[in-house]
């Protein structure tokens, strides 16, 4: 018998049907931002926690439309400022 959550896509699809889909999308993008802003000079766990917490607070306070613009700005700056 195959495992219940055999793939990440299945897990995300299942969560999206239970919880508000924009919220799941928002959480996944927050995690991507947190991972893309990681630096070897900082503690990765605290940065992930702070970034996701920040986006969750912003989402709950001002709504997803404004936070989407903020997310895009932060993600683009994180991509172009990372050391390769």
From Swiss-Prot:
This is Uncharacterized 9.2 kDa protein. It comes from Vaccinia virus (strain Western Reserve) (VACV).
């Amino acid at each position: 018998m195959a495992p219940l959550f055999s793939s990440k896509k299945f897990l995300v699809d299942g969560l999206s049907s239970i919880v508000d889909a924009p919220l799941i999308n928002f959480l996944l993008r927050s995690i991507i931002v947190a991972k893309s802003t990681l630096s070897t000079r900082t503690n990765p766990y605290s940065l992930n926690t702070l970034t996701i917490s920040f986006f969750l607070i912003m989402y709950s306070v001002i709504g997803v439309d404004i936070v989407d613009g903020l997310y895009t700005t932060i993600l683009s700056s994180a991509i172009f400022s990372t050391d390769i």
